[in-house]
Amino acid sequence: MILKEQETLGFQSEVKQLLNLMIHSLYSNKEIFLRELISNASDAADKLRFLALAKPDLYEGNGELYVRIICNKEKRTITIIDNGIGMCRTEVIDNLGTIAKSGTKAFLETIDVKNSKNNQLIGQFGVGFYSAFIVAQKVIVRTRAAGASADEGVHWESTGEGDYIIAAINKPERGTEITLFLREGEDEFLDDWRIKNTIGKYSDHITLPIEIATNSENKNNNIITWEQINKAQALWTRNKVDVSDQEYKDFYKHLYHDSNDPISWSHNRVEGQQEYTSLLYIPASASWGIWNRDHKYGLKLYIKRVLIMDHADYFLPNYLRFVKGIIDCNDLPLNISREMLQHNRITQNLKNAITKRILSMLEKLATQNNEQYQNFWQHFGLVIKEGLAEDPNNSKSIARLLRFSTTHSKSMEQNVSLDEYVSRIAEQQEKIYYIIADSYAAANSSPHLELLQKKGIEVLLLHERIDAWMMNYLIEFNGKSFQLVSKADLKLDKFLNENTTEQKDMTKAFEPFIERVKKYLGDRIKEVRLTYSLTDTPAIVTIDSNNMTTHMAKLIVASGQNKPDIKYIFELNPLHPIVKKVSNTDNDIYFSEVIELLLDQALLVECGTLENPNQFVRRINKLLNHDTIVN
């Protein structure tokens, strides 16, 4: 190769230090160099297509555009070839001699096509080309602009050390040829399988065919044959009416290596101020890392069908981290390495739109296919519950997705929606009642439910660890506020229908007994009172509306903090035989043992444990031997 008019020029921006910083720090993984160079080649093809609309001669009789890759193991080189627009000497100096000057970006500004719906240019920064130096100790570029003569070819060469060589060459073919001379230790990229895998990961859906030489060193006839690597058509760019359900399923399985079909998907193209296409999937089951804080999640982010980020978590709130899929945008603010989003109003608007799209998709699934939604809830219900705290702007939509066990369903399965609950309540019922316990069995058999069950009032049975925390954010639904039935201020007057005069008389008669219990227990409890909300249970403990719930306190302890001090209200059932009997006794020993036992029973039901279970057992044994107490 004869070099003419050779010059050695310095880079026009911060030279060696900037190149060093960019090459060794800007990119998080080495294989990205191939993505960047293929993206540049795709841009070159798109530029040619655009300009050839007005000047067909630019095709020079060959309109079949491509990107081709040759790996030479003997010379330890990788060559990326395109037959796109190419560059003249001035463009080479401007685009390759300046860090962070993008030929694509300048092209857009020059012809003002940023608003063109058919514009497919993906380059945003001039640094993409320099990612070649991540794996290459030297890079040679041979290029010729479309429409120029063969002797107007340009040779560019650099080791990334702060300057470069530029010269004139004879190049019959238009387009650009980039040869990378690999550093020691980078021979993995000479393997065809490695190249194919990287292209499949990052550039599978570029519409330009990407081909690799299969016998570039054929010694007999020196004929190179080419194998196309990419599919060259992004499924999400097709009209959704032309894509079959099976194609959507196969694409999901290919993308995520999941053997199961997705439960649901949503394919949408949005046009307007911010144009983008999204293809969102709901998996059939949760991934192993869904509860691992370090587990990566997020959508695959494409810019003009080129994968920019494998886990663009910014577009998904944390409570929707199980959602998979892609988002393909025409333009997004990226950092200089194109590996990270720059968060601003545009990206926030996209996140809001995608979040609403997913919630709408789930609500549609719940309405149209209850069986599939129940399968979804079984795997992802706990994650959805996080959304009430994380995303208050969408709390109404999230609340509609919640499912509960209730006293009506008589099943541990969480299959009752709040809409269904509200549709069944009596007209005079102003609240949605719920109870929190450590297990379904404990919730379903709680003494706090006795009167409500007797009156046929449905109660939500909450028994998962997150529920106490969640209910701090679930305040109302369809105008109905939520009422924890273990709160002391539970108002059930409308449902009691008892003779209030009789209750008043009984309350007055029990006043001495209540005072006696208060005096005995002292400051161990907040208050002692009678309750008429029990039917089969002698006593319960409750908390007032200003106090932390028992299960919220458990969450605090589980997080490693000190146990909060909760003062319970001790409520006694005056209609229960045990309470009647102890209220009439003069035996102080019997009185103290029974009161202690009733309080321990109530605390055990409420808390699931006691501070001194051995003493509790001793009292039970002592009461079983009643003569011991009497004597």
From Swiss-Prot:
Gene3D superfamilies: 3.30.230.80, 3.40.50.11260, Heat shock protein 90, C-terminal domain, Histidine kinase-like ATPase, C-terminal domain. Disulfide bonds: none annotated. It is found in: Cytoplasm. GO terms for molecular function: ATP binding; ATP hydrolysis activity; ATP-dependent protein folding chaperone; unfolded protein binding. It comes from the Bacteria. Residues 1-338 are annotated as: A. The keyword Chaperone applies. PROSITE patterns: HSP90 (PS00298). Residues 339-554 are annotated as: B. Keywords: ATP-binding, Chaperone, Cytoplasm, Nucleotide-binding, Stress response. GO terms for cellular component: cytoplasm. Pfam families: HATPase_c_3 (PF13589), HSP90 (PF00183). Residues 555-631 are annotated as: C. Molecular chaperone. Has ATPase activity. Belongs to the heat shock protein 90 family. Homodimer. NCBIfam families: PRK05218.1 (NF003555). This is Chaperone protein HtpG. The gene is htpG.
